[in-house]
């Protein structure tokens, strides 16, 4: 993941870190974030920089928390609440401040752009266990967000469209279950890829199943099929793709080297049934 190496120095990071110590004090967290945002006005570029630092801080903290931890839950809930309930930021004239056509912080302006910029995994080289776990954790975080945004029938919950990262689910599942993992440079790399797919099923399984049942598609070839299924004209979630993933994840368990990742895959395959 490409996240600023100085992220821990950001005031936004310190605010979120403090929130994890007192997750029930959401209003106090909002107040500190608003103060931070208002200090940038009227400089629009500085406000955008603030948002970039805030979203980077969310993603970095999520990547450092175990996917099953209470801290991940707290970050997901905070981002949900920030999206839908945080008071809007107003300028000196009392007008709502907007970025990219959205009121700050409603609809999380620039969060999607930030997530996309850092969403890459170095599968062309051997990775250490820390990098492996970071990738699995951030996939779990985004899967949790998607589960909050999309109901088990595949429809978006009103007001939560900014949290729908179901396309990222396709990318992670395709990388692990539709490509030839024998081409990856090391077992830790394939463990990371398979583990990332597993947490999508574990934390957003019913949502992804609902999207598959409703044939959710995306424009162009962003959700195309992987090499092992190159003859399929998949452009998103489908019933037969879901069946292929179920089969492939079960078989992928035999490729996993780390016991904790193997256990994770076992839990995910059970959740898919």
Where in the sequence are the language-model features?
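Eukaryotic acidic, Ser/Thr-rich intrinsically disordered low-complexity regions
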Residues: 241-273
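Eukaryote-skewed repeat-based solenoidal scaffolds used as protein-protein interaction platforms
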Residues: 2-235, 269
């Amino acid at each position: 993941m490409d996240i600023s190496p100085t992220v821990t120095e950001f005031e936004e990071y310190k605010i979120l870190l403090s929130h994890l110590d007192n997750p029930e004090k959401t209003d106090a967290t909002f107040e500190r974030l608003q103060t931070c945002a208002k200090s940038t006005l009227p400089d629009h570029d500085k406000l955008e920089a603030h948002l970039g630092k805030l979203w980077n801080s969310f993603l970095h903290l999520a990547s450092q928390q175990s996917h099953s931890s209470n801290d991940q839950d707290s970050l997901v809930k905070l981002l949900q609440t920030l999206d839908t309930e945080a008071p809007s930021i107003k300028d000196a004239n009392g007008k709502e401040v907007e970025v990219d056509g959205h009121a700050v912080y409603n609809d999380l302006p620039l969060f999607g752009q930030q997530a996309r910029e850092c969403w890459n995994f170095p599968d062309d080289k051997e990775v250490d266990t820390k990098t492996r776990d970071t990738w699995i954790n951030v996939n779990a975080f985004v899967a949790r967000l998607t589960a909050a945004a999309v109901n088990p029938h595949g429809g978006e919950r009103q007001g939560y469209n900014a949290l729908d990262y179901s396309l990222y689910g396709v990318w992670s599942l395709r990388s692990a279950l539709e490509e030839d993992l024998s081409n990856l440079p090391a077992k830790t790399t394939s463990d990371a890829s398979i583990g990332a797919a597993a947490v999508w099923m574990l934390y957003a399984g019913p949502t992804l199943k609902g999207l598959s049942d409703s044939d959710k598609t995306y424009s162009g070839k962003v959700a195309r099929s992987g090499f092992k299924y190159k003859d399929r004209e998949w452009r998103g979630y489908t019933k037969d793709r879901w069946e292929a993933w179920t089969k492939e994840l079960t078989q992928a368990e035999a490729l996993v080297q780390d016991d904790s990742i193997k256990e994770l895959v076992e839990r995910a395959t059970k959740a898919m049934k």
